[in-house]
Amino acid sequence: MKHADLISQMTLEEKVAFCSGSDYWHTASIERLGIPSILWSDGPHGIRNSVGTHDKDEPKKKDKKGEGMDALLGGIPAVCYPTAATTACSWDPELIYGMGELLGEECISEKVSVLLGPGTNMKRSPLCGRNFEYFSEDPYLAGKMSAAFINGVQSKGIGTSLKHYAVNSQETRRMTVSAVVDERTLREIYLTAYEIAVKESQPWTIMCMYNRLNGVYGAENKWLLTDVLRHDFGFEGMIVTDWGAENDRVLGLLAGQNLEMPTSNGDGNRKIYDAVKRGEISEDFLDEMVDGVVDVIMRAKEVLADGKGYNAGEHHAAARKIARESMVLLKNDDNILPLSKKAKVAVIGQMAKKPRHQGAGSSLVNSIKIDSAYNTMFEAGIDVIYADGYAMTKKEKKNSPETYIADAVEAAKKADVAVLFIGLTDEFESEGFDRTHLRIPPEHVALLSAIRGVTENIVVVLAGGAVVEMPWIGETKALLNSYLGGEASGSAVTDILFGDVNPSGKLAETYPFSLEDTPCYNNFPGHTATVEYREGLYIGYRYYDTAKKNVLFPFGFGLSYTTFEYSDLKVSADSIKDTDTLKVSFKIKNTGDRDGAEVAELYVAQENSTIFRPEKELKGFKKVFLKAGEEKEVEIELSKRAFAFYDVDLGDWHVETDNYKILVGASSRDIRLEGSVKVESTVDAPVKDLRETMPAYYSADVMNVPDDQFKALLGHEIPESEIHDYPNLTFANTLEDSACGKNGAKLCKMLRKFVGSEGMACSIALQTPVKNFVSMSMGVFSEELGRQLLDILNDKKPMGRGILVLIGKAIPAVVKGLPNLLKNI
């Protein structure tokens, strides 16, 4: 232990106090031992410190957000950087490292010790409401970007919390659903990004997920937290729950989870204390868990004492640079872009003035300054004609859509080119709920169609944090995907549209033609009890490329205002052992007349695999800046893992002796160079041929995998997919689980009427376990009230007037507060 001297001076009560937060955002402290309380804060692309820089024991000053639970929704003004979905498209770890440094400086200024991020979950389905917070569908790219982010933040002496470890790929029933996943898929897809981040950056903390993995909650999954994370990956830091993710405090601690957040008002501490007294937990083991918490506190203590400020203007400028290097040019017919600064431009769409620059939920930042594309064009002297194009607010939506469209059409008629700002709104994607389709608002599509009726010179700037369908793409000459570009997204868009910056972003996820094309279409978001990952390894381009499925835009795709030529591929050897390192080199030349940057992508494909594998997998990449006419040589090294698959029987990564193609290109579908190397295995282990038992996985025909093949993949029976707990519901059940009962149906109907029938509030109210109503209500909803509620939900007690009055005092506060509270998760 690192802090045995301090821990030896603690009482048992003091030790267990360090196993949970002292409130929503702080850890415990012991003044006599010089152990301060530290502050945690969201989030991955900007500080969302709802507490501020006041001392923990001082009362918080009132602000416009008020006090109590609603106060948690607020946040200090901070720089809002592009979201992970955006920055991943930069394919530039150095850029993300720099962003991490800036966030670290801001944490120091606000006395934040641990920043909750990055989010490293895999984009299994484009429907996931939180995809804007995650990097990629590819674990190698996500892992490299995560490691860069972590190293950047922690270089300033501030901790990070890599989240949400590890199989948390949906918002529907995110607190209770069990992800049913085979071990090979876990190791190769859902755990690899975390493994890379841990081995290359050692985050101070890792946040475990809410949901269950193969029946076991993430917060108490010993295999996941100890066997894999600590033993296999070599994680040395502290494990913290997601806010409110604790299910059984004693099991969580024994599984290797150090800290429960937020405070459990002493309940979790009492359970640990009693377990120690019973001998269920040894005090030596408790000391080790406490040591992990104390270590994080003491590492941050010295830096926070400096209390240095930061230059908000410089950080805003950096956010602009990050945004413009991450945005992706998807279409540019007739080289309509870049636009002439002398052109008369119709700027259409309210997003041009009110950019959707970030997502909704726990990552929501109170941006210091927001650049709009309209203002930055106007300030640059561009001749601009503006039209709203569509309604944004409820009040505006009472007006006729035709009125907005008519004004926009008139503006387009007077201009040389029409630039339309359209995309996903907060109502269409957010933390707390998943999308049910991939469409953008219909009024945006109608607007584009109307403008196309009067001009063919149309440029679309698409905003949003996730993949969308584009049956309308033929209506526009150019398409710039700005994703969610942070507070400087507007100026970054202007920089690209008018050629001050050459776009260099490339997609970190595949854009299919339709939702029905996605590999997990029939298995997302799953059932009431489970979600089955029947597609196995085949997510994203691994599926589309192997199944030869046509896509709208492939993984790794992105255009530039210049052109690049690849040549002279060399491999350091024709044959290597799996213990050797292979060096791959090639040249890239800028053959256009503009300076620009190209992302070179390296994929590996096994030629004659016995085990089923994706057609090819990303194993290296490099972003290279080249002046017009310049040529550079790129070198990428490949080690054993670039050729290996995870052998479940062997319990290790294994390379099958075979020839492997080395593929270098501009996207997964645009391979420019090809080489080959023979790799010889140094481990004498047979590779199973599973074609007879799992043929669907050899052909990537995974849309409808039969039960027998999925069972064979899992290596065990397929778990029951539906919840049948009524009338024996427990604190782990949700209100939605009671809907089949008489009282539960009434209560669910009442709540839908109270919070609305869809969106974040409805999802949270109905899909939050009763235990979280207790733990997250700041004492408003007591455990006793929870028991009484369960009696009602189980139809053991009538919904009489007296109990309704009692519950009625708490339910509104909890339901109103939960969306705000859970936005802090």
Task: Provide a role label for each language-model segment.
Residues 716, 754-757, 795:
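Surface-exposed polar/charged interaction patches
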Residues 675-743:
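Charged, amphipathic alpha-helical linkers/stalks
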Residues 3, 12, 744-747, 786:
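Short amphipathic alpha-helical segments that mediate assembly, nucleic-acid/protein binding
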Residues 761-825:
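C-terminal non-catalytic accessory extensions
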Residues 576, 581, 683-702, 765, ...:
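Conserved catalytic region of serine esterases and O-acyltransferases that act on ester linkages
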Residues 1-643, 659-663, 668, 778-779, ...:
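Glycoside hydrolase catalytic-domain context in secreted enzymes
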Residues 739, 743, 748, 755-759:
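N-terminal, non-catalytic alpha-helical interaction modules of very large eukaryotic scaffold proteins
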Residues 640-686:
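Terminal connector regions
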